[in-house]
Every structure is written in structure tokens, then in C-alpha cells.
A protein has these predicted regions:
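P-loop (Walker A) phosphate-binding loop of NTP-binding proteins
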Residues: 261-262
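N-terminal pre-P-loop "Q-motif" helix
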Residues: 231-251
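Conserved P-loop
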Residues: 268-343, 411-431
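Pre-Walker A (Motif I) flank of P-loop NTPase domains
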Residues: 251-257
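Conserved coupling/interface region of RecA-like P-loop/ASCE motor cores
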Residues: 39-70, 423-456
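Active-site-proximal, substrate-binding regions of enzyme catalytic domains
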Residues: 2-118, 124-229
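Loop/turn-to-beta-strand initiation segments
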Residues: 2-4, 351-355, 369-372, 395-401
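Conserved RecA-like ASCE ATPase "motif II neighborhood" in helicase/translocase motors
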Residues: 14-16, 351-374, 379-388
């Protein structure tokens, strides 16, 4: 059955190619959507760029035919601009001059002739109003991944026979030797993914554990389990796995995805390895550490803020500097005598260009070579932004995506549509991607913080 999908502006602002994702159905753009795209085309950042991409796509279709009558797209669907439905009545409580309500008028006006009609929007309130008016509404699902509980964690606990357990560090263990137990105590074969981290337990003594990683048809021991990057020693299994992923060369592990709640040392450990690789590595594996954080306030583009680039992004980078202060002042033997001396050391590192910070808006279109690139708070990125970063990685560059899918501050994103979860699910199984999700038990915050997390 052919459906008519009415597209809201916020869909095109996040996914400018969205019109091509509805198969051989009708795609309806209310005229007010074009008005909103026109008003956004000069905006700085991702919003303006996507508005321009959507407009260019519509211009290509305009050259092929009459958009008011409908133009066929490459996927077989028909795109049409709807300029009518101005006389459709809405409840008095819905002002007719509001763009969202004009979109509702289009949905209501065309459904008599073009059933079924589906409104596609990321606006939760608009979906609620649509339901009240008897209009089917949904989110844009093409970029949605599964619910967070079922998303790839990058780690598993598996069991193995005692004799195989004893041989693990020397020989590793074949995947077919690993097993899990179901509810009835029966042994079942685990589903494992390339580069997945394993907590290996001996079946006769489950308190004994080894840590490993899936490589081909075997689980192998961690290569960097004895490392202490920048003097930092891992405190739990998650940090050992994180260290392994970060210490691997850019050739073997050019992409690392780390998910977990605040306090699990995601940023701290990533910076520690970066400092070790850039400051203490004579081979010059990386030229610099580049740190970026997305501006969660999507409607407040950083380009409008006063000052130069570094002044603009300084508030965004304050948590990064806090971690740097803790790392640089962590050596008991070389602890700095006062705050001024510590700040002087940090300023020296920045002045030498060994650590650089940039806002996401300023790195679009650039390629990075021999760079240790940390993207903090990546859950506030769109899938399109993450794709743009990963596909720009130059030779010798390592990209580290950090974030918590449960702490999203950006409008129209959730735990299923954010860029971090999107990259995690689609890069699962890649031999070039290492992933780890830190557990709640691995949080290194104070007892008060942990108690508050449980209670509040």
C-alpha cells in the first residue's frame, strides 16, 4: 500500500537525505518547510549546512519537473510540495500561523485523498498533537538503532575448562572452547564479535579470571595489561579493556568507541594515553592530541559568541582542562608546588601545539594526519556528524569517541538516534574498531556521588 509521508523541517535539518528513505511512497513537503529551510540556510554549524544540503537536493528535483505535481526520485518515490490546505480547520487552541500547526493542516487536508498519511517529525509535542487529531505520527527511524539495553557493549563474561584456562596466557583459547550457561545450567555457545573483550573464568574456580580479546577464531591475552600510561594504573576490568583499545596503534585500532556513565574515567584515561603517546613516546606515533566537544545547544551556534575560537570554546573544554590538571599533577615525586606552576605547565603544552582544542563547527571538512583525536560527549552528535568525523580520518590518526547515551542534552536526539550509539552499532564487528562499555560498578566517583546516583 502506497503511503504519504509528511516531513517536518527538523528531519531534514538532522538528515538532509531523509526524503530518499521512504521507498516507493509519496513524500510530502508542506510549503512552510521550505520557508523554514530558507530561514536556516545561513545558520552556522551543522544546522545551516544541512539546510543547504536539503535545498540543493530539492533544486535538483525542481529541474526535473513540477514539485507541486510531484517529481520521481531515484528510489522510485514521488516528492511533492504541498501549498494548499490553507482552509483546513484546526481546534481554536492551535494558532494557524504557527509552522507546526500549518504542517498539521497539511496532514489533515490530504488524508481524505491520500490515505494513509504519516507525519514524520522529531518533535514529541507535534507527535502528541497529531495523535489528538487522529493523524499517525512517527520519528525518522532509518538512523535508529535498537534500545540501549540491547546495544553492543564490547564485552562478555565467558567460561572455559580448567586446563584451557591455565594455558590461556601462553596459547590463548579457541572460541569453540568458550561457553555460557542458560537458566537450566546447560552449556551454550556464546555469540562473539571481532575485538570483543572477554572476562574469562575457569569453570571449576569462577573466582579466577583472565582478561582477553577476540581475535579471529581465538581469545588472546591483552597486549598492554602491564602498561601504565602517564603513570596511571587500571583499577578494574573495564579500565584494562579501555587501556588495551587506546594503547593499540592507529594502524590496528584507528577507531575506539567508549560508552559509560560519568565517573568511569573515560575522558581521564583517554587523555592519559594521549599524553603518554605524544609526550613520552620517542617514535612520534602522533603529532598532537586534538580534543573536541559538540555544542549541545544546537540553536546557539558557537559562531555567534564573542571572541576568537579558543575563547568561544573555553567553557566547553573546562572539563577537559580539569582532567589535564589532575593527570599532570598526579606524580607524587614531581607534584607542582602551587596552582600557578601547574597552570604554567599546562599552558606550555598548549603553546607547543601538543594539545589542541576545537569546536565541532570548526573541523567540518578537514582531514587529520597522525592525530590522537578525542571526541568527548559524542552522544550529543548526530549520526551525520559522526560519519563526517570518522570518514575524515587521515593516515596515522586514531579517533576516540566518548560518551553516555543516557546523558543527551541535544534536542531531537535520544539513546537510539544519537551519533555515539549509531557508530557503535554500525561499526560492531569491524576489525578496525575497538569498543567498550564501562559498567556502573566501575565508576570511580566518591561514595556520596555513587549513593546519589542510586537514590536520585
Amino acid at each position: 500500500m502506497i503511503k504519504s509521508y509528511v516531513i517536518d523541517t527538523n528531519i531534514l535539518i538532522q538528515a538532509p537525505y531523509a526524503c530518499q528513505c521512504f521507498e516507493e511512497n509519496r513524500v510530502i513537503l508542506p510549503l512552510v518547510v521550505l520557508e523554514e529551510l530558507d530561514g536556516l540556510k545561513k545558520a552556522e554549524g551543522e544546522k545551516g549546512a544541512n539546510a543547504r544540503r536539503a535545498i540543493r537536493f530539492l533544486e535538483k528535483l525542481r529541474l526535473k519537473g513540477d514539485l507541486l505535481k510531484g517529481v520521481q526520485m531515484e528510489n522510485g518515490g514521488i516528492l511533492r510540495v504541498e501549498a494548499n490546505c490553507v482552509n483546513v480547520e484546526l481546534p481554536e487552541s492551535l494558532p494557524e500561523d504557527k509552522p507546526d500547526n500549518r504542517i498539521l493542516k497539511v496532514c489533515k487536508g490530504i488524508r481524505e485523498e491520500e490515505k494513509p498519511v504519516v507525519l514524520v517529525t522529531k518533535d514529541l509535542v507535534l507527535r502528541l498533537k497529531a495523535q489528538i487529531l487522529g493523524i499517525e505520527a512517527q520519528d525518522f527511524s532509518t538512523e535508529q538503532v535498537i534500545e540501549e539495553e540491547g546495544q553492543y557493549s564490547g564485552r562478555q563474561i565467558c567460561y572455559v575448562a580448567e586446563d584451557k584456562f591455565k594455558e590461556f596466557k601462553k596459547k590463548g583459547v579457541h572460541l569453540k572452547e568458550l561457553y555460557l550457561s542458560d537458566e537450566d545450567g546447560n552449556k551454550i555457545q556464546p555469540e562473539l564479535t571481532e575485538n570483543e573483550f572477554i572476562i574469562l573464568k575457569a569453570d571449576q574456580s569462577v573466582k579466577k579470571t583472565h582478561l582477553g580479546r577476540v581475535e579471529g577464531k581465538k581469545v588472546v591475552s591483552l597486549e598492554f595489561r602491564k602498561s601504565q600510561p602517564y603513570g596511571i594504573k587500571p583499577r578494574n576490568a573495564g579500565q584494562y579493556f579501555l587501556q588495551e583499545a587506546l594503547m593499540k596503534s592507529a594502524e590496528k585500532a584507528p577507531l575506539v568507541i567508549v560508552k559509560g556513565m560519568a565517573g568511569t574515567a573515560k575522558t581521564f584515561y583517554s587523555l592519559a594515553v594521549g599524553l603518554e603517546k605524544v609526550l613520552n613516546n620517542p617514535t612520534g606515533e602522533y603529532r598532537r592530541i586534538l580534543i573536541c566537544r559538540p555544542n549541545a545547544q544546537f540553536d546557539q551556534d558557537i559562531g555567534f559568541l564573542p571572541g576568537d575560537e579558543q575563547e568561544k570554546i573555553s567553557p566547553l573544554m573546562r572539563p577537559i582542562v580539569d582532567n589535564l590538571e589532575q593527570l599532570i599533577d598526579s606524580d607524587e615525586e614531581e607534584r607542582y608546588q602551587d596552582e600557578q606552576e601547574l597552570q604554567g605547565k599546562i599552558e606550555e603544552i598548549f603553546a607547543r601545539g601538543l594539545i589542541q582544542t576545537e569546536a565541532m563547527n570548526f573541523i567540518r571538512g578537514r582531514s587529520f594526519v597522525k592525530t590522537y583525536l578525542i571526541i568527548d560527549e559524542a552522544q550529543n552528535m548526530t549520526p551525520n556528524q559522526v560519519k563526517g568525523i570518522i570518514t575524515r580520518a587521515g593516515k596515522g590518526t586514531k579517533i576516540v569517541l566518548l560518551g553516555d547515551p543516557n546523558q543527551i542534552d541535544r534536542p531531537f536526539l535520544d539513546e537510539r538516534t544519537n551519533g555515539l550509539s549509531y557508530a557503535s552499532e554500525y561499526m560492531k564487528g569491524s576489525p578496525l574498531c575497538y569498543q567498550i562499555t564501562m559498567s556502573t560498578e566501575e565508576c570511580e566517583r566518591s561514595e556520596l556521588a555513587m549513593d546519589a546516583i542510586r537514590r536520585l
